[in-house]
Structure formats: structure tokens, C-alpha cells
């Protein structure tokens, strides 16, 4: 299935996964950008944003678990997020953490909060519609991860 066919499939888990990839880039960029703040609270939230981005890399790009040397404990933690509902919950929690960052004042971290919330909504819609989780082949869903090993 090509990328265009994946988007035409109307499976919300595909939309969630690609929104998650954008979240990875945004969380890493905003985490780094806001870490150079003079506000201690904002620095803490920027570190949390960076950690969220790093976790999302392994959740949304499954073949990285096979090629990166990680511990079995970390692998088991990441493998918990294989259903739409678990991913929706994870994204909602990450989004809530970034929304709380507003206590330190307005910052770019709100963009991460909004996009994480959108990804959570996509995964929740997939769960509500009882759609099976389908990983994008482009990101190592069905096929690429098996070819590597």
C-alpha cells in the first residue's frame, strides 16, 4: 500500500501515526528551543517535552526497536502502546502535561500540546470506530521491520 492509499483508507490510526511523527519533530524542536529560557518551570516542561519526543520516536517508528540497542524493560514499556486506546491515552497524558506548562506563561510548548491532543483524538476515533491499529508501511509497520531482522 502506498502512502496515498494509506491516507485514503480512512483508518484514523494511520492519521494518528502520521500526526505522531509531526509531534516527534515538534516536541524535540520546542523542547530544545524552550530549554534556553530563564524560567525554571518552563525548563522543566521543555525537558518533559524532549522526553515525550524521544518516547514517541520508538512508539511511532517500530523498526527502531529492532535496530537500536535498548533494554528489554524499555522494549516492553514501548510495546504496551500497540492499541489505539493505549496510544490515545499516552498522547492525552503527554498533551495534558504540556497544557499545564501554561502556568509558566505562554510559550511555544502550547503548539506541542495542541498537536499531541489532535493525535490523541485520531487514536480515540480509531478506537471508537473499532478500527484495528494499522501501522504505516512507510514508518516500518507491516513488512519493513520483518525484513530488517
Swiss-Prot record:
UniProt key word Transmembrane: yes
Subcellular location(s) per record: Golgi apparatus membrane
Bilayer topology annotation: Multi-pass membrane protein
Protein name in UniProt: Golgi apparatus membrane protein tvp18
Function noted in UniProt: Golgi membrane protein involved in vesicular trafficking.
Superkingdom of this protein's organism: Eukaryota
Residues in coiled coil: none
